[in-house]
Structures are given as C-alpha cells and as structure tokens.
C-alpha cells in the first residue's frame, strides 16, 4: 500500500512525499482510512517511532474546513516539548494546504501572544491541558 491509496488529497500527498514518506506504517494503514471515512473516535496503541502523529494528523488536515476560520480540532499533549513537536509535524504535513492555521498553546509562553494567534483564525490547536483550560476560562 502507498499513501495515494488511502484517500489523502494531493496537497497532503505532496507534503508527505517531501518528508520522504513512501509507504504508510501499520498504524497509519489502519487509522488514516478509518478517520477519514468515519465520524467516530479511535483509540490506538503503537510503539514510539511508528508514525502515530501522522496517523491522526493527516486525517485531521484532510477533514479541516479551510474556509471556516475557527477552531475545529484540539490536540492535547502532556508536555510542552510534545506539543511543539506535534505542531512542527502538523505544519510539515500541511505545507501545501493553503490557509490552514495551526497554533501551539502551552505554559511558559506569553499567553497574550497565544490568544492573538487563536483569534486570527486557527483551525487546529495543539496544546497542553493546563494552558487549554486556562484559555477556555478566559
């Protein structure tokens, strides 16, 4: 199986080709088609380094409504480091997806800067639980 077989649009396929991805990993083969075609949750388990971020991130990018400039997905991360890594990966996957805005929100960074970024039309928010809760309360 190759990535073009699992239902991703051409912009995403071009971005993952740039990253050197040729064939989906087992977790990606199972998760991506399911998440693209279903409106249900998925719980999956895989070892470190098996492509879990792409397994959930690529379908998120595929399904985002670009013309809706408001939050559509929140990805919660246990640490600031993982939040930044997932944001970097998502930005790489969305390299050719015009007008998609991904914002990282986490403690230890200026909250006003993060609020401005969110107010500018972020569709995907990647954040730590504490900062996400703080922002919701505001």
Which role fits each region the language model picked out?
Residues 21, 46-49, 62, 90:
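Structured catalytic cores of enzymes that bind and process phosphorylated ligands/cofactors
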